[in-house]
Amino acid sequence: MALNSSAEDGIKRIQDDCPKAGRHSYIFVMIPTLYSIIFVVGIFGNSLVVIVIYFYMKLKTVASVFLLNLALADLCFLLTLPLWAVYTAMEYRWPFGNHLCKIASASVSFNLYASVFLLTCLSIDRYLAIVHPMKSRLRRTMLVAKVTCIIIWLMAGLASLPAVIHRNVYFIENTNITVCAFHYESRNSTLPIGLGLTKNILGFLFPFLIILTSYTLIWKALKKAYEIQKNKPRNDDIFRIIMAIVLFFFFSWVPHQIFTFLDVLIQLGVIHDCKISDIVDTAMPITICIAYFNNCLNPLFYGFLGKKFKKYFLQLLKYIPPKAKSHSSLSTKMSTLSYRPSDNMSSSAKKPASCFEVE
């Protein structure tokens, strides 16, 4: 959406250079429907994740801290999703006022950064637990995990401030509708470039490189362990899970990041073609559905890698209350083999162990 400032008389009034861009009847039906599905599935799934981790598993492991915070971040975003569903169903007419516009926009941005940062920390934790289990034991503590999560929430909040400051309700004069949108007073403003690049680099590129590196090193360590322990049957599920984690993250966010970058070029006036604007504005909500639906499934995806998580999850569905005492490990299907190449262990000591655990 390319917007031009026209007048200001108490209400911020603007002109839309491409008033028909992204405004299609199927979008106004399909997107609210998808938002509703994401809301129901996300609220149900993430609420159960919070209950299982906090009440059944008693929040005793490093990874459980990250997964709990991941689910909480998703719930914060999901609570604002009905607003966006109504907004889209009303053909991009925002009826909720300026304050909710800022809050809902900040929630979307906050969830993006918090989720990505938490997944990145989870990948680093898995790398340390599997490749350097002994050396990292003193560093991988509950205190460190909780402090890390506090820092992540602060960083995500800081990264979301531009949405609070610059996202506002505007009245578009040439279409007679009120929208919740970013608007830059000058085409020469460096703000959209900064926000777009921050979202592309800090919200995707750097985290993806760290996640890719962490799981690649885990992959290599496990392959080396299998070569040493040739008598042990190879479990290819481990490698499929690693591949799924990396590809799941990549393909969830790449479409949204690409169209975010194109939207910045439109806002800057680099792209003037309304046909391209229409493609971008039409694709943007679809990429948001892909990214945030997968985002909201992440706690379930990572949680169900653990046998104990699945056990407690099924207990919860059967209304079986948690026991007074609970085991402290959240093991995963990847817990069949470990390799400690940097812990100076003798070859005789390199035995299969349940160290590919979310612990």
From Swiss-Prot:
Cell compartment(s), UniProt: Cell membrane
Membrane topology qualifier: Multi-pass membrane protein
Pfam families from the UniProt entry: 7tm_1
Alphabetized UniProt keyword annotations: Cell membrane, Disulfide bond, G-protein coupled receptor, Glycoprotein, Lipoprotein, Membrane, Palmitate, Phosphoprotein, Receptor, Transducer, Transmembrane, Transmembrane helix
Main location per the UniProt record: membrane
One GO cellular component term noted in the UniProt record for this chain: cytoplasm
Glycosylation site positions: 4, 176, 188
Domain of life, source organism: Eukaryota
Post-translational modification: C-terminal Ser or Thr residues may be phosphorylated.
Region (Disordered): 337-359
Cysteine pairs bridged by disulfides in the record: 18-274, 101-180
Amino acid composition bias (Polar residues), ranges on this chain: 337-349
Lipidation, S-palmitoyl cysteine type: 355
GO molecular function, one term: angiotensin type II receptor activity
Outcome of swapping residue 238 to D: Abolished angiotensin II-induced inositol phosphate response
Biological processes, Gene Ontology terms: angiotensin-activated signaling pathway; blood vessel development; brain renin-angiotensin system; calcium-mediated signaling; cell chemotaxis; cellular response to dexamethasone stimulus; dopamine biosynthetic process; drinking behavior
Membrane side Cytoplasmic: residue ranges: 56-61, 126-141, 217-239, 305-359
InterPro entries in the record: ATII_AT1_rcpt, ATII_rcpt, CCR1-9-like, GPCR_Rhodpsn, GPCR_Rhodpsn_7TM
Topological region Extracellular: 1-25, 90-98, 166-190, 269-278
Physiological role: Receptor for angiotensin II, a vasoconstricting peptide, which acts as a key regulator of blood pressure and sodium retention by the kidney. The activated receptor in turn couples to G-alpha proteins G(q) (GNAQ, GNA11, GNA14 or GNA15) and thus activates phospholipase C and increases the cytosolic Ca(2+) concentrations, which in turn triggers cellular responses such as stimulation of protein kinase C.
Record-linked PANTHER family: CELL ADHESION MOLECULE, TYPE-1 ANGIOTENSIN II RECEPTOR A
SUBUNIT field: Interacts with MAS1. Interacts with ARRB1. Interacts with FLNA (via filamin repeat 21); increases PKA-mediated phosphorylation of FLNA.
Name of the molecule in the record: Type-1 angiotensin II receptor A
Gene label: Agtr1
